[in-house]
Amino acid sequence: MDAKNVWVANDDGSEIIRAREIAGASLDYDGNVTVRLTGGDGSAVTIAGHRTHHEGSRPDDFHRQLIRVISELSDAAEAFLVRAVHDEARGWRWATEVL
């Protein structure tokens, strides 16, 4: 997977990382999605966290959904930004936008 043109933002948009730097993704018991970055320092970034009660639970496979979206976008000619969003009708999902 060569995701050179795919970027992932945390839910408030204050951090954006290049998707190809993601070594792994995890979902903790609170529903936070954290990605581990490649490189020797083992850095980790929480990209979906701190939800409120009215937003409900994130799907049990939300971290896998992120990897699937990145994989699907990895061959695209355009650059994309991926971020977690919540709406009342659809619940939690990964939204993409062209950069």
Model-derived segments and spans:
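Eukaryotic intrinsically disordered, low-complexity regulatory linkers and tails enriched in Ser/Thr/Pro
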Residues: 1-16, 20-99
